[in-house]
């Protein structure tokens, strides 16, 4: 076990894997998976490692998905993009804007690559991937059979999809299809975006505002390792939300279509005065309470203990129990993040 995973996870946690393989096409990915499986090893497929926390050394092969390529089909009503799973997400957002194909600007600066975007149904500032996803192309690892799932078949939810359930270990995402309508409609429901005028705003202005909000609030993983938002924004019943709002009338809350209410995890953590709290080398970020950072050579145990502490404090004060958005990886694969920090 001497292949360091530190360069392959944005948290910068130093654990090792038995083997690390970069796959630049589907065949290389299948070969690496089949070789490791024949040896009886667990296999983990990673993009840019921007949403994982390695808890210990990984007893198997980590495959880095670097399948590239962008194809564009110009239709009368929309642009259709077919994008390789290994393409960087933010670079794609910039590229589509430069080419005059707006629609992804709210999702600027989300770390990671295209292949990870459907797994989490990534989202920010009022837009989720499902809004623009046309399909996801996968390969069944055991057989090499190609499968195309429509957006509906992906069963997208809040930071959720079929790729976290039935398709988790049996399939690898090789490409994502996006549909960007030519009739652009700005989404200006969050943060500084609410100050923009919907009748005159341009996609570039939305992009600039999102980049400004993210760079001023969020730490750069190159300076302080992190995995972006550590916790999901909790979705609670209207009853729970009303009880909380009776006590804390200023709490940010976002009613959902199904009658539930989404709360702001960052606000809940902030109300517990946890910004700057440190355990070992891990800390709650001082500008954005939703982000846990590797401040100084943090061990994975430091991050787990800090996450547990934050969850307990918020639970005791608000009776709302936060769940990590980050995926926890043990020696032979993903483990329950909630159980790990409970």
UniProtKB/Swiss-Prot annotation:
It comes from Escherichia coli O6:H1 (strain CFT073 / ATCC 700928 / UPEC). It catalyses: UDP-N-acetyl-alpha-D-muramate + NADP(+) = UDP-N-acetyl-3-O-(1-carboxyvinyl)-alpha-D-glucosamine + NADPH + H(+). Keywords: Cell cycle, Cell division, Cell shape, Cell wall biogenesis/degradation, Cytoplasm, FAD, Flavoprotein, NADP, Oxidoreductase, Peptidoglycan synthesis. HAMAP family: MurB. It comes from the Bacteria. The active site is at 159, 229 (proton donor), 325. The keyword Cell division applies. Its cofactor is FAD. Coiled coil: none annotated. InterPro entries: FAD-bd_PCMH, FAD-bd_PCMH-like_sf, FAD-bd_PCMH_sub1, FAD-bd_PCMH_sub2, MurB, MurB_C, MurB_C_sf, Oxid_FAD_bind_N. Residues 13-183 form the FAD-binding PCMH-type domain. One of its GO terms (molecular function) is FAD binding. Pathway: Cell wall biogenesis; peptidoglycan biosynthesis. Pfam families: FAD_binding_4 (PF01565), MurB_C (PF02873). This is UDP-N-acetylenolpyruvoylglucosamine reductase. Gene3D superfamilies: 3.30.465.10, UDP-N-acetylenolpyruvoylglucosamine reductase, C-terminal domain, Uridine Diphospho-n-acetylenolpyruvylglucosamine Reductase, domain 2. Substrate binds at residue 190. The lineage of its organism: Bacteria, Pseudomonadati, Pseudomonadota, Gammaproteobacteria, Enterobacterales.
